[in-house]
Regions:
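Short, well-formed alpha-helical segments that are part of the catalytic scaffolds
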Residues: 6-24
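A conserved acidic beta->alpha catalytic loop
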Residues: 20, 32-41, 55, 89-90
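Glycine-rich, basic loop-to-helix element that forms the pyrophosphate-binding segment
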Residues: 55-74
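Short beta-strand-to-loop acidic/aromatic patch adjacent to the donor-nucleotide binding site
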Residues: 76-90
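Conserved donor NDP-sugar-binding/catalytic core segment of glycosyltransferases
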Residues: 90-125
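A recurrent flexible, glycine/aromatic-enriched loop bordering the glycosyltransferase active site
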Residues: 118-119, 135-153, 169, 175, ...
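Catalytic donor/gating beta->alpha subdomain of glycosyltransferases that bind UDP-sugars
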Residues: 165-228
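Membrane-embedded multi-pass helical conduit in multi-pass membrane proteins
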Residues: 239-311
Length: 321
């Protein structure tokens, strides 16, 4: 078993990330995507094998992880399981062994995840949103497209679907999950802590860029696998069609079309009650409901950006930090 840690300008977050892998007793490689800080030097100082991606090709998390697996198999060809960890996360020391035991037990299981926690959930409302987003029940994961970037994966399964799509600048994890599901594999979330994440998100602009990336991922998932149709249609309706209709009909309806804005209030109310019934506090439910509405517009921007990128044939990473 070994770990691939990926990063780009992670700063002070990288050292505890690499140290957490060492504390878990794992061999590891660090893959750097053109950092302008001292991340590569730090990895070298900690004696973690370093892979620096060639900047002549576009960077992507998928490309970094693929390169990391190649380096692991070059160094330790007997490796059966790989832990993927982002450089802004620290790994729980007991998780790799628990994940390996699950993969040993279930031959058709390709991926094992656990509970991801936000390190500073109260540092900002944006960190709080991430903390709420990470929460999900343990068990067999029915929706393979819900895969995130932190996981333990069976190397043979990873290779059977040719790894990550290196061209995907967002949504590369759901893309991998869908392809593994189509190949007959399953994903299990075990009821154990997996890692701690540091979102380091303190502005609406950062949140917006991250949400735009989510819309880009939605469009990519539908274009590649016809996955996420409902979510994509929702972004198209609430983020484009309804606002366009409201504006277009203002004059003919003498302003009555503005009443359609109430639709956003209705979906916000539904989201609020959903989270309240699931056990969240009223303040958390209210926070999620507001940003759920904002996300419809950000997702639409991401969808349009994906379409423009596809027409140009060029994709570049979307960074919020």
């Amino acid at each position: 078993m070994a770990a691939v840690v990926i990063g780009r300008n992670e700063g002070a977050r990288l050292e505890p990330s690499l140290q957490s892998v060492h504390a878990a007793g794992l061999r590891a490689v660090y893959v750097d995507s053109g950092s302008a800080d001292k991340s590569p030097a730090l990895a070298t100082k900690l004696e973690v094998p370093l892979v620096e991606l060639d900047c002549s090709r576009p960077f992507s998390a998928g490309r970094a992880r693929n390169e990391g697996v190649r380096e692991i198999l070059r160094r330790w060809p007997e490796t059966a399981y790989v832990v993927f960890l982002d450089g802004d996360c620290t790994l729980d020391a007991a998780f790799p062994a628990a994940a390996a035991a699950t993969l040993d037990e279930y031959a058709n299981c390709a991926i094992v995840t656990g509970h991801l926690a936000e390190r500073y959930p109260d540092a900002s409302i944006y960190n709080r949103l991430c903390s709420i987003e990470w929460a999900s029940p343990a068990g067999i994961v029915e929706t393979m497209s819900s895969l995130g970037g932190i996981m333990t994966i069976r190397v043979s399964a990873f290779q059977s679907v040719h790894g990550f799509n290196e061209q995907a600048i967002a949504g590369e994890e759901p893309d991998l999950g869908v392809r593994l599901g189509l190949a007959g594999y399953t994903m299990i979330k075990i009821d154990r802590p997996m890692a701690t994440h540091d979102a380091h998100m303190f502005s609406f602009r950062q949140w917006w860029i991250r949400a735009v990336r989510g819309g880009h991922a939605l469009a990519h998932g539908y274009a590649e696998h016809r996955e996420g149709r409902r979510e994509l249609l929702s972004a198209l309706f609430w983020g484009l069609a309804l606002p366009a209709a409201i504006l277009a009909l203002i004059w003919p309806t003498r302003g009555f079309s503005l009443l359609l804005v109430a639709g956003y209030g209705i979906i916000g109310w539904r989201v609020y009650w959903h989270y309240l019934r699931s056990g969240r506090t009223s303040s958390d439910a209210w926070l999620v409901s507001r940003f759920n509405i904002y996300s419809r517009f950000a997702h639409m921007v991401g969808v349009l950006r994906y379409c423009a990128n596809r027409l140009r044939g060029r994709f570049h990473i979307i960074e919020y930090k």
